[in-house]
Amino acid sequence: MEFSVKSGSPEKQRSACIVVGVFEPRRLSPIAEQLDKISDGYISALLRRGELEGKPGQTLLLHHVPNVLSERILLIGCGKERELDERQYKQVIQKTINTLNDTGSMEAVCFLTELHVKGRNNYWKVRQAVETAKETLYSFDQLKTNKSEPRRPLRKMVFNVPTRRELTSGERAIQHGLAIAAGIKAAKDLGNMPPNICNAAYLASQARQLADSYSKNVITRVIGEQQMKELGMHSYLAVGQGSQNESLMSVIEYKGNASEDARPIVLVGKGLTFDSGGISIKPSEGMDEMKYDMCGAAAVYGVMRMVAELQLPVNVIGVLAGCENMPGGRAYRPGDVLTTMSGQTVEVLNTDAEGRLVLCDVLTYVERFEPEAVIDVATLTGACVIALGHHITGLMANHNPLAHELIAASEQSGDRAWRLPLGDEYQEQLESNFADMANIGGRPGGAITAGCFLSRFTRKYNWAHLDIAGTAWRSGKAKGATGRPVALLAQFLLNRAGFNGEE
């Protein structure tokens, strides 16, 4: 699908369709008023007859409006004008894309980007429109033999901006939006792949392909079990012992800043390509969704793709911690004591708390990069789902400025996160009689004690932890990976690179 920006009046558009907004109660947006004036009150007459109230999600498709060059005008209900916020704006864009696609409009000029969204500029509105459009049209049908496609799918979308001065920021918004959307799609595709295809070797192959596609700035190294053993990553290795698939750690290095003192930002993604729970096996109901336990790695992969596509002037390292947690004769057990790469020992009380056992060794491994900051992304705890539900990602950090940066990026991108505490009193729940710590701390504050566990391996750098257990995928009829938190991390890195979205 092709996107572009232009600045022009609606009466001069020869597009197949013009999209304009209508507010409650039957109030035309400024652009719709212009079209109404040109058409000698044709549109307002329809509204007076009760054809459209302007409620969110309502649509009315008009054909051959008098004195208008475009074949059709699509009126979209936007709710009450003063209540048009970020969430409602994206819902309006989503409804627009679906309606255009369903009605066979192959191209359209959209004036919704001229609507006032409180606290948001034209760059934000255009970029969010691009990201929302790509999200709306996403489907995962690679494994289906009968692929359903619209007869006349939407192919071209033009977003209008008020003045020519805003064309440059609009074009940049499209560039950024397309790169972020491509990263989200890549993460979703990986997450939706079945575990018999997407194992650690598959993740490694995708990481290598990324380096091949962006060979100027990207290098990928894959570390196998033998090298992990030599490095002392016994905790990581223990988790994968029960699986016939080899554990593989893929390290993707992007260099966008050649300065010697430019330290990298490291992103670590939990990549459990299937989590049965191991010996502490999960209930069978919903176990198929444990293919999504690698969504942290998928998100990191998507972010690395975005960074490489935009050639951001920052150094970023992405680590995909690929592994599979299966029961078997060689599987690790409750009661085992593992020696981590850091030298600290861990008593295993539950083999289904495996993500932290993989991550702790990776968090030690990345010390060698002398990072500016480390952010791990993991579907880590069901407790985070209980705490925050499926709308907001859990955030913990040992460095307040880093946490504030991530929260700000989450608000900018609409990919929201909420900070949880890492108090010393929670650390006491991890005490063990037989090792330096246990791998679980009981039910109270489970998301926080998991973060506390990881914090013991991050004392040498600034670190943040994103628990995406509630936000990485949807269940039910709309089951599928969401691609979160690619947008959040993309915004964080854009901000670091100086592209903060200000016009």
Curated annotation (Swiss-Prot):
Name one matching Pfam family.
Answer: Peptidase_M17
> InterPro entries given for it?
Leucine_aapep/pepB, Macro_dom-like, Peptidase_M17_C, Peptidase_M17_leu_NH2_pept, Peptidase_M17_N
Single GO MF annotation: manganese ion binding
Q: What class of enzyme is it?
A: hydrolase
Q: Where in the cell is it found?
A: Cytoplasm
CC terms in the record's Gene Ontology section: cytoplasm
Primary residence: cytoplasm
Under catalytic activity, the entry for this protein gives: Release of an N-terminal amino acid, Xaa-|-Yaa-, in which Xaa is preferably Leu, but may be other amino acids including Pro although not Arg or Lys, and Yaa may be Pro. Amino acid amides and methyl esters are also readily hydrolyzed, but rates on arylamides are exceedingly low; Release of an N-terminal amino acid, preferentially leucine, but not glutamic or aspartic acids
What remark does the entry make about the cofactor? Binds 2 manganese ions per subunit.
Q: Which residues bind Mn(2+) 1?
A: D275, D352, E354
Known PROSITE patterns for this protein? CYTOSOL_AP
**Binding annotation for Mn(2+) 2:** K270, D275, D293, E354
**Which residues does the Swiss-Prot or TrEMBL record annotate as the active site?**
K282, R356
Function, please?
Answer: Presumably involved in the processing and regular turnover of intracellular proteins. Catalyzes the removal of unsubstituted N-terminal amino acids from various peptides.
Q: Which PANTHER family match?
A: CYTOSOL AMINOPEPTIDASE (PTHR11963:SF23), LEUCINE AMINOPEPTIDASE-RELATED (PTHR11963)
The name under which this protein is listed is Probable cytosol aminopeptidase
Give the source species. Shigella dysenteriae serotype 1 (strain Sd197)
